[in-house]
Amino acid sequence: MSNCVQILSDENGIQVCFDIQQEKVMAIGEEMNAIQEEAYMNGENWDIFLQYYLAEYAPEVLVGMETDPEAGMYAAYYDSTPESEAKAKKLAAVITSLLEHPEEIYRILQEAGDEIEWD
């Protein structure tokens, strides 16, 4: 798992935290912004991009998910259930895969960036 993405859990629920201020993530965000001018990659726009991506490629992860994007952090929350734990693990794996293969992000922006309703 990327050191940019962590899964935290307790009796209140499961949280997937994505630190968007890491150097690698910032570099990906800068390239995203170069491709799509409206894609200034703060927490809100990472939320918007991930919502778009997940709706297309992993819609089951969105079921029961709540998000709280901040300036330097993206967080997703699930209830504390075995099903939600599996969804959180998949979400973390999706984010990690995108970070390891940012060309997928860039491809989506080139093909559909204007369809995404950026912040």
What spans do the regions from the language model cover?
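N-terminal, charge-rich interaction modules
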Residues: 1-26
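Surface-exposed, low-hydrophobicity interaction/linker segments
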Residues: 17-63
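Short proline/glycine- and acidic-rich turn/helix-capping motifs at secondary-structure junctions
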Residues: 104-119
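Aliphatic-rich, non-membrane protein domains
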Residues: 3, 21, 97-100, 104-108
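Amphipathic protein-protein interaction modules
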Residues: 46-104
